[in-house]
Amino acid sequence: MSILVSGGAGYIGSHTCVELLNAGYDIVVADNYYNSCPEALKRVREITGKDFKFVEADMTDHAAVEKVFAENPGIDRVIQFAAYKAVGESVSKPIEYYSNNLNCTLNILDVMRRYDCHNIIFSSSATVYGDPASVPIREDFPVGATTNPYGTTKVFTERILTDCCKADPELNVALLRYFNPIGAHPSGKIGEDPNGIPNNLVPYIAKVAVGKLEKVHVYGNDYPTPDGTGVRDYIHVVDLARGHVAAIRKLEEKPGLFICNLGTGHGYSVLDVIHAFSKACGKELPYVIDPRRPGDIAECWCDPSKAKRELGWEAEYGIDEMCRDSWNWQSHNPDGYKTAE
């Protein structure tokens, strides 16, 4: 039996593949390389010393999803990462985001039920909570008052999966609500390598640190936070990947619907992260204050106690280790995976 990792060549997907292989699971990876590249999977093989099946496939193409299952009998679990993921871009391209992100999961669900596959772990997001009334955020907080289309696609997909779980007693679903993944594998072989100018904070800081970009743009310093910049719950991507392994085991032990935050429970501001990265790379990094971005909120950090209690999982890395590993990745791969070409 094997696990289909859709979007497995991406940032979180590739790190999760490492943890799955290290834990002894057989995997099939499907990706269309929209925001990823083959080099990431080559390096997953190098890190683990293990091979796996890869299929180049677009999850929005129903026939392509069907082919993945037909040609790989024995898939009994899916970890669904495939999605567009840039919050800012989603504001300007809502149709593309709704179409892509919903259809990826709808197609997978439709094919799963015809191939006796009854377990799916969905890559959700803290954006489902919108602008929370208070922090830390618990899983029983209201969802749906999202501030951008990306977050709304996660809300809609969660609802689809929940409804399918209610309708099909055999279907088991884990909704993992990530906070802000950063960092890279400690080997420095895989990390975040966005196409074009990064949308997320740490890849942008890293590009400044290696001289690829001039300065960090800080979007807003007038939020009601200690230093006026946005506060987020940053989580090391390796910790996050290990959370998926824990979720697989959870569904084996207790079928049904499971919803869980994956974060550290600590909030760090944009300036906190810039200072931590400066420490990691050994130089002060220039930054400029810009106006707020549409869709951004003041602060977002979680109560991670459910993950510890029910998954037996908790984050091990702090902000210094996250920035250390990001810098290790970026300094050895200044052009990302293109460095290897």
Spans of features found by a protein language model:
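Short, flexible active-site loop motifs that bind/organize anionic cofactors or intermediates
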Residues: G7, D31, V55, Q80, ...
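Catalytic core of nucleotidyl cyclases, primarily class III adenylyl/guanylyl cyclases
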Residues: S187-K189
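Short-chain dehydrogenase/reductase
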Residues: Y98, T147-V155, G191-N199, P203, ...
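N-terminal Rossmann-like NAD(P)+-binding domain of SDR-like oxidoreductases, especially those catalyzing
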Residues: M1-A184
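A general boundary/transition motif marking the beginning of the first structured unit of a protein
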Residues: R113, E192-I197, G295, E314
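Short, basic/glycine-rich phosphate-binding loops at helix/coil junctions
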Residues: G183-H185, D222-Y223
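C-terminal substrate-binding subdomain of Rossmann-fold SDR/epimerase-dehydratase oxidoreductases
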Residues: L201-E341
